[in-house]
Amino acid sequence: MSTYIILINWTDQGVRTVKESPQRLATAKKVIEAAGGKMTSFYLTMGRYDMVAIAEAPNDESVATVMLNLGRGGGIRTETMRAFTEDQYQDIIAKIQ
């Protein structure tokens, strides 16, 4: 499984319906699980992003599909980054010639 960091902002619609956010989070977890992944962490944040989630998924295509499906609801905008573990980082650096 690959790890992904998902940076999330509410849209105007998302802020207007913020009380429904916990239900949307539960739905997002189910959508990720249906794609073969798992949300491992979720944070409400202060600053540039409203929320941050950490998820594991089998591949980039699965995550792209999930993020597009969740974005279709209109309540959030996301920026997703593929993350590498420290061990993966060490392997990548070791391959530099």
List each model region and its residues.
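A compositional/biophysical signature of low hydrophobicity enriched in polar/charged and small residues
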Residues: 1-97
